[in-house]
Amino acid sequence: MPTAIVTGGARGLGRVYCLALAGAGFDVVVADLLDTGDAVDEIEAAGGRAIGCRTDISSATDTEALAATAAGEFGTIDVLINNAAFYSQIVRGPFHEVSQAEWDKTFEVNVRGTWLACCAVYPYMKEQGSGKIINIASTTCFKGTVGFPHYVTSKTAIIGLTRCLAAELGPDGITVNTVSPDLIPNPSLRPSDEVSDQFVVAERPLKRTQVPEDMVGTILYLAGRGSDFVTGQNIVVNGGAFCQ
């Protein structure tokens, strides 16, 4: 069976991706700083195979260990989903009030972490002549969302990184794409996010709140053989908000 690594896979969107991939026949490596036991148990209870791996994606040592663990346990690394992000701890405010420490932390996780995870899996994917990297960005990149410029800028960087890697890794048989969701309410969101969601829903033709499961079809498409000739792309999943 093919193997997929999902960073930030213990809860939220990452956990949804893990369950969907397991249901589609993937062996799943749940990578997170949080406890991965519940996610692994849920996958195994449904008949899938999974392991957990405590990982700080901003650490090269951790990401290299993650890749080695995945390959050692399941034999191949076929898909990497870079989902882990620094977001829920951010307090919205004017751009000039963002602390340097918070700016740096956001980039350490969202940008450096994504790059390090790609670096870690690359030797395995190159050796096997195939692989799929799926990076998670955000529609805030296109709207210039006010209040957290460091997060928006970090996610915009992900799209640039995706295009660079798609061009460089294509000859090795590796595709690299980005998926950009809109605001997706989850237990970690703040009251201000709930208010924002009301405005987001009003902007889109599909008049409802986006849920994590809305991402599954796109993720499985990019992880599967049907997308073998698709690379360097950013797929926006937001209920058509940008068509108005």
Can you describe what each PLM-predicted range is?
Residues 123, 167-171, 228:
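Alpha-helical segment proximal to the catalytic Tyr-Lys
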Residues 91-95, 99-104, 189, 200:
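Substrate-binding pocket helix/loop in short-chain dehydrogenase/reductase
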Residues 138:
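Residue(s) in the substrate-gating loop at a strand-loop-helix junction
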Residues 87, 92, 143, 198, ...:
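Short C-terminal tail/terminal secondary-structure segment
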Residues 115, 130, 209-237, 242:
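C-terminal substrate-recognition "lid" of short-chain dehydrogenase/reductases
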Residues 75, 170, 175, 230-232, ...:
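Short, small/polar-rich loop/turn modules that mediate ligand/substrate recognition or access, typified
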Residues 118, 154, 162:
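Active-site helix of classical SDR
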